[in-house]
Regions:
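Residue-level signal for alpha-helical context at structural boundaries
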Residues: 54, 61-62, 150, 188, ...
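Bacterial Sec-dependent N-terminal signal peptides
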Residues: 1-26
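Short alpha-helical segments used as structural interaction elements across diverse proteins
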Residues: 59, 63, 125-128, 221, ...
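Long, intrinsically disordered, low-complexity segments
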Residues: 17, 204, 272-296, 300-304, ...
């Protein structure tokens, strides 16, 4: 009987397929058009995945800023970024996996004559905000990068644009986007907006208030990028920050969070790395852990678990650490649904505190914003308002008595507040110069102020690579970016 079934099955299938054989003339290998909103959400996910990831093949920043250490493999913790091709992976993720999709999404949506003009304007502005965000990551990672010639398939050898010029254009684009976002119209539907929409409710056509939240997100990005310029163009920084302040994130309810789900392949990259991948590599860094312990920081138990003896112990960055002897990240940090924070109230309040210290016109006092930022961080991770009040009452935490001038006070607390946002932590350490971290054991270089350019660029785009390397002062990790003057 089984043999007869095997013989009969092809006959049945052939009969079923003979009703319409014209479809076999279709170009089955030609990709079908992907909707613009889907490309947008895919690009945003690729950015988020890269920024949250803990894989040493993708994201090394937790070790660079000494939030985490490694148990066994020390290459990346020791600033060896070339063995695994980290610069290439970072470059590819931003250009190919994010910016290329965002550009195509913009093209498709622009050409859609059926789309309501107001919705189209909002969608294009939101896409551009994310393009600015991604290009900002590239500039802050490498310095001069392809910009005007980037993403042009007809030009395989793009020139590199001056980083400061790129930054100025990004700031202009961001200001234009803020002017175009119109709260009278919807933006992306809920199934495509994984930051402010509900990713599960795919039947919805829109979510009230999402455009307002994108306005706040874009304004915080404007503040953040503006402040990066403070040491090299204080006038431009002041204008950007003061313009954005009233529009920027004003509470935790405005936080821009990429929402991961509990099922594969949509769960958090940290969950994928640590739980699914069963990695026993990642441990607390002694540098951060010692500070959390010394200051009785309520985030200690929210950031990390104990070692096998029930104690909180950090591992030495760059040195082999016995996994059972040191603390590991707390389970909430790598939960399947742990979100990635694109921008939040914590960061925005630290920016406002800094703005007051720089003499910019923003409401409130530096101390108020500093306190708000720390409180928001403790609450975000699951602490209480009472925990925050007790912590802020400590002389080594209180703004008026904490060690150092404002850069040190804000820089130190921002380093803690940007836990699980290590790329942004790397930017802030370079910008504010605090905390002043010691080099890891057996460091392969000085502190990395940038990534070197990818090997592919050196080999395939050699002339433009050589010009770019000379323009920034040499393709070395120690070379400072244009905004890093101190």
């Amino acid at each position: 009987m089984r043999k007869l079934l095997y013989i009969a099955l092809p006959v049945v299938l052939l009969a079923a397929c003979t009703k319409d054989i014209s479809r076999f003339n279709d170009e089955t290998k030609k990709p079908q058009t992907v909707p613009g909103p889907m490309l947008f959400s895919n690009a945003v996910k690729n950015i988020s995945d890269g920024l949250q990831n803990a894989s040493v093949n993708i994201n090394v920043f937790r070790f660079t800023v000494k939030h985490w250490a490694m148990a066994v493999y020390q290459d990346e913790a020791q600033f060896d970024f070339t063995t695994r091709g980290i610069p290439q992976a970072w470059w590819t993720r931003m250009y190919r996996d994010a910016l290329s999709d965002l550009q195509e999404a913009s093209r498709i949506i622009s050409a859609d004559a059926t789309l309501d003009p107001g919705i189209k304007q909002n969608q294009l502005a939101i896409i551009d905000v994310m393009q600015v965000y991604a290009y900002g990551i590239l500039v802050n990672s490498f310095g001069n990068v392809p910009y005007k010639d980037a993403l042009n398939s007809d030009n395989l050898f793009p020139t590199y644009d001056d980083a400061k010029t790129v930054y100025a254009d990004l700031m202009k684009r961001l200001a234009d986007d803020l002017g175009k976002l119109n709260t009278a119209s919807l933006g992306f539907g809920a199934s495509d907006d994984i930051i402010f929409g509900d990713p599960i409710a795919s039947t919805k056509t829109g979510v009230d208030g999402t455009v307002i939240k994108y306005l706040k997100f874009a304004a915080t990005v404007q503040m953040k990028m503006g402040m990066v310029l403070a040491a090299v163009d204080n006038a431009a920084a002041k204008t950007a920050v003061e313009t954005a302040d009233a529009k920027a994130i004003a509470s935790a309810a405005d936080n821009a969070l990429f929402k991961y789900l509990s099922n594969s392949p949509s769960y958090s990259p940290l969950y994928s790395d640590i739980v699914v991948g069963k990695r026993s590599d990642y441990v607390a860094a002694k540098d951060l852990m010692d500070q959390l312990i010394a200051m009785s920081d309520p985030r200690k138990t929210l950031f990390f678990g104990t070692n096998n003896n029930g104690d909180y112990v950090g591992g030495i960055v760059g040195k082999v650490n016995t996994f059972s002897d040191v603390s590991k990240p707390a389970s909430n940090v790598y939960a399947a649904t742990a979100p990635y924070v694109f921008a939040d109230y914590v960061e925005t309040e630290f920016l406002r505190a800094e703005a007051k210290e720089r003499g910019y016109t923003v409401a409130g006092t530096a101390e108020q914003h500093y306190n708000n930022a720390i409180t928001a961080s403790i609450l975000f991770w699951g602490g209480s308002a009472a925990d925050a009040a007790t912590y802020l009452a400590r002389p080594d935490v209180a703004y008026t008595t904490a060690t150092g001038a404002w850069k040190q006070k804000i820089g130190f607390q921002k380093w803690i507040g940007l836990y699980s946002r290590p790329f942004d932590g790397w930017v802030e350490i370079r910008r504010l110069d605090y905390p002043q971290l010691s080099l890891p054991v057996n460091a392969k270089s000085g502190f990395p102020n940038r990534f070197t350019y990818p090997l592919n660029e050196q080999q395939l785009n050699g002339t433009n690579y050589t010009t770019a390397a000379a323009a920034i002062g040499g393709d070395k990790v120690e070379t400072k970016l244009f905004w890093d003057k101190f």
